Amino acid sequence: MEKIHEISAEHLSLERVADIIYNNYQLRLSEDARQRIVRCRKYLDEKIARSEVPIYGVTTGFGSLCNISISKHQLSQLQINLMMSHACGCGDRVPRDIVRIMLLLKIQSLSYGYSGCQLVTVERLIDFFNAGVCPIVYMQGSVGASGDLVPLAHLCLPLVGLGEVEFEGRQMSGAELLQLKHWESIALASKEGLALLNGTQNMAAFGCWAIIKAKQLSQWADCIAALSLDAYNGRIEAFYHAVHAVRPHKGQLDTAARISQLLAGSQIIEKSKTHVQDPYSFRCIPQVHGTVKDTLQYVEHVLDTEINAATDNPTVCPDEDLVISAGNFHGEPIALPMDFLTLAMSELANISERRTYKLVSGTRGLPSFLVANPGVNSGFMITQYTAASIVSQSKGLCMPASADSIPTSQGQEDHVSMGANAGTKLYTVVNNTERVLAIELFNAAQALEFRRPEQTSPVLERLVANYRQVVPFISDDVVMYPYIAKSVEFLQTQTLPDTNPTL
């Protein structure tokens, strides 16, 4: 049965965004949303007809050209010119899933009736989404104020038969798409180009994608860390509730409880130990993983607000009879949190790599580099090198993009957020963290075999059994990179162990 999501003023959660994108929902406008869009457009048309006062971006030029008035017969051409001139993207393409989130968020933002778009324009964006049309958008070009002008220009050019798209497995021009689908080119009305291009949907889409993936990785990090702790013959006392009750950060409490749940019933963890404590990368898992959880919760809260907002300019307020040029396009509210999340995810990878290092170090009864005959075999030596390389790259990406600002548009736009750069850096670091965690899993599962016949917990034994269906125990040196790739794929496709995680 076809799954339908109705675009309305009801709250749109990140969980719902993930459901729509990854479970192939179709979109449709609620009747209330249709009425709001039509009402706002009607008000704007009437405002233009009766007012002699210039309205920024509606009857004037853009940016530093805001004082140049545009005659009424040029208003439609002004919108086309805006879209063409602002399509200056460079670099790699924005991934398909993120482009689809951009489309969804742009439709949602326009549906509130504060932007002045025509109903037919919003409906065509919905047509794109429902048909699986993916406009080709580029990673570089947005300074994060006035919104995401460059990527949103590429997103919306196909409305008028320009730009390029991917559709049904091939790349084609916007004109070819319209011909193929028998769609008319949209005749943009006044202000529409600005409504389409102004907004934070590119930044917000990267943030949504990152939160959705990072929450999964945060759960995986706990599972893998628990496996590493047991394979390293670590101690459980550092996870006792009494320890964390006296420093009750929520993420810390949740992580300690979850590690304890994951290791419940382990023969290895219950054995008496000769060592009195573990290295920080094991002992401080609750404090580090927990802080990442708290960061995720904060950033999700910010993005939750952003994706339920109208972020273009000027803001059209029919009830107040106002068209106000302001700054809701500025990306600062999400640029800073995305930089924060980049740092948090880099730290999650950082501590993971440290555990991998300990596993291959030939201590706690484990052989050097986790291979039975070290010397003739190098074993897992270089997996740690790879993790170290990736972690180092992520650390280099932790310089906050939002710390920089370069004036644009002849100084009229003299402070920008660089939030799009924060988003693309975050995208890289989240993917890097997934790879580092996959490498830790590869090492931890290998190390566990040297504890046999003792067993870890039933939950983790099931996890390892599933993992062994795709990645074997390594007895002698083999080409390793396919197993790293399979480990990454395992994290992407395998269901997390059922321990009722809180985040």
List PLM regions with ranges:
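N-terminal flexible segment immediately upstream of the FAD-binding catalytic core
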Residues: 1-53, 58, 62-64, 69-90, ...
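C-terminal auxiliary extensions adjacent to catalytic cores
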Residues: 2-25, 29-36, 40-43, 48, ...
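Cysteine-centered functional microenvironments
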Residues: 137-142, 319, 323
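FAD-binding core of FAD-dependent oxidoreductases
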Residues: 56-70, 74-78, 85-110, 138-160, ...
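Conserved, non-catalytic sequence blocks in retroelement Pol enzymes and Pol-derived host proteins
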Residues: 114, 143-145, 375
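Generic short alpha-helical segment signal, independent of protein family or function
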Residues: 67-70, 83-91, 103, 107-110, ...
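FAD-binding glycine-rich core of flavoenzymes that anchor FAD
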Residues: 114-140
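Alpha/propeptide regions of enzymes that mature by internal proteolysis
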Residues: 93, 113-118, 219
